[in-house]
């Protein structure tokens, strides 16, 4: 997808964009970015690690790179979703359903929220558990069609996809820097929140 390549373009491209932005002047109306671009910018500002993939082969390759980078090749991956475990059955994962034995959590999400770069999740992903009960590191598999403008759109999407039984335990993950990494960034909004070291494997499906 050319849009995501544009987002992660060269430094010279970014400088050119910044100059054009300055030329607009401070009194010009702000340009409204597309929701996928807004999400990517906000997500990275929150400390998330973003890997855009055009197909499943790239997803598997990126996953293996994450495992190597963190020395997780021999570690256990917490996977609650059986369908997700089947999808990644050919990868180098060592799946478990034990919270105590796992080093990281592989999951999906409900939606990706463009306005604040957060991930919307529910009991479909985390059952009735609290985020603090999970490993510090998350690997989230999602698709570009899951990007929504705001939480309201995300909640409406959850309702429309689950007409028979609306999931519970709906929450967002927004802070993607572990507490020791954000000591210089303390503020009252992040107090008490559950921070996660989070990788997003984003598959193009539009």
Label the model's feature ranges.
Residues 2-206:
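The feature marks the mature, well-folded catalytic cores of soluble enzymes
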């Amino acid at each position: 997808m050319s849009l995501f390549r544009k987002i992660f373009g060269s430094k010279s491209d970014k400088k050119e964009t910044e100059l054009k932005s300055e030329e607009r002047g401070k009194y010009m109306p702000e340009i409204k970015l597309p929701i996928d671009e807004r999400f990517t910018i906000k997500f990275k500002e929150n400390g998330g690690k973003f890997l855009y993939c055009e197909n499943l082969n790239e997803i598997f390759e990126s996953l293996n790179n994450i495992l190597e980078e963190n020395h997780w090749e021999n570690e256990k991956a917490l996977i609650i979703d059986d369908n997700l475990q089947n999808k990644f059955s050919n990868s180098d994962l060592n799946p478990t359903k034990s919270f105590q034995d796992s080093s990281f959590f592989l999951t999906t999400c409900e939606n990706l929220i463009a306005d604040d770069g957060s991930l919307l999740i529910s009991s479909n992903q985390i059952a009735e558990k609290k985020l603090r009960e999970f490993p510090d590191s998350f690997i989230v598999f999602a698709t570009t069609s899951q990007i929504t403008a705001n939480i309201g759109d995300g909640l409406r999407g959850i309702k429309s996809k689950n007409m028979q039984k609306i999931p519970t335990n709906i929450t967002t993950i927004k802070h993607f820097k572990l507490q020791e990494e954000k000591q210089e960034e303390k503020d009252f909004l992040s107090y008490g929140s559950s921070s996660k070291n989070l990788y997003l494997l984003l598959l193009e499906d539009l």
